[in-house]
């Protein structure tokens, strides 16, 4: 006669003891049971949730769009002063070091964001990274941080120059202010504002890439 213990094991096929008798390891949530519900696929410790990966890709797209728009506006920023004495001179973005700095920073961030968009699409479509995982995490976070500081410093310096031009503390060619070159000043200010937008989005990207890096360092791949 079977003992109550063995009888209980026979009535409860989900216990580990039953799995040991028939040679099949059965887990409590039905994993490994034929016809049982499939367990959800677990994410690797060093990976973000799919929604977070999509959000990161969206931030890359916004960074690219804002930095490209700022780059184009600054690169085409040229105007002719309107002086009452009849002396007209052309003012260009290359006349100011800080504006050249903004253009260079936006160009670098634009190219970097474009490359990151390609890498992000590859990961979403293929499910794997182009570079080794450890290198990819450090690459993304390091460049996000570095380029965020780069474009922020460029915008900060250019904002001071734009303000001083408006207040006539700095004169264009030593004699003109924004009253005589209003279109030039306005385009420069718009370009700086868009560059600040690019900084905001790449800074948010660095938060996600930093979280992914810390998660990978603590929990492993």
UniProtKB/Swiss-Prot annotation:
Q: What is its main location?
A: membrane
Region annotation (Disordered) maps to 1-21
Q: Give the source's domain of life in one word.
A: Eukaryota
- Which residue ranges are assigned to the Extracellular compartment in the record's topology? 76-101, 166-189
Recite the UniProt keywords alphabetically: Cell membrane, Membrane, Transmembrane, Transmembrane helix
Could you list the residue ranges that cross the membrane?
55-75, 102-122, 145-165, 190-210
- Residues on the membrane's Cytoplasmic side span 1-54, 123-144, 211-221
Q: Where in the cell is it found?
A: Cell membrane
Q: Does the keyword Transmembrane apply?
A: yes
* Disulphide bond pairs: none
> One Gene Ontology cellular component annotation?
plasma membrane
Kindly name one Pfam family recorded for this protein.
Answer: CASP_dom
* InterPro entries per record: CASP/CASPL, CASP_dom
How would you describe this protein's topology in the membrane?
Multi-pass membrane protein
The record describes its quaternary structure and partners as: Homodimer and heterodimers.
**What is the protein name stated in its UniProt record?**
CASP-like protein 4C1
Species of the source: Pteridium aquilinum subsp. aquilinum (Bracken fern)
Q: What does UniProt list as this organism's lineage?
A: Eukaryota, Viridiplantae, Streptophyta, Embryophyta, Tracheophyta
């Amino acid at each position: 006669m079977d003992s109550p213990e063995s009888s209980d094991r026979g009535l409860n096929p989900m216990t580990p003891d039953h799995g040991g008798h028939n040679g099949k390891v059965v887990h409590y949530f039905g994993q490994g049971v034929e016809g049982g519900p499939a367990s959800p696929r677990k994410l690797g410790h060093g990976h973000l949730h799919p929604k977070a990966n999509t959000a990161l890709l969206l931030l890359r797209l916004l960074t690219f769009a804002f930095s490209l728009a700022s780059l184009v506006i600054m690169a085409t920023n040229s105007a002719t002063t309107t002086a009452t004495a009849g002396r007209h001179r052309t003012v260009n973005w290359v006349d100011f070091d800080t504006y050249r700095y903004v253009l260079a920073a936006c160009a670098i961030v634009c190219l970097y964001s474009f490359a990151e968009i390609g890498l992000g699409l590859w990961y979403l479509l293929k499910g794997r990274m182009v570079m080794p995982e450890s290198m990819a995490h450090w690459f993304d976070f390091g460049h996000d941080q570095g380029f965020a500081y780069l474009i922020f410093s460029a915008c900060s310096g250019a904002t001071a120059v734009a303000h001083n031009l408006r207040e006539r503390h700095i004169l264009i060619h030593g004699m003109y202010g924004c009253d005589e070159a209003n279109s030039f000043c306005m385009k420069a200010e718009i370009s700086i504002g868009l560059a600040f937008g690019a900084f905001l989005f790449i800074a948010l990207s660095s938060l996600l890439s930093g979280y992914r890096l810390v998660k990978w360092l603590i929990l492993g791949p």
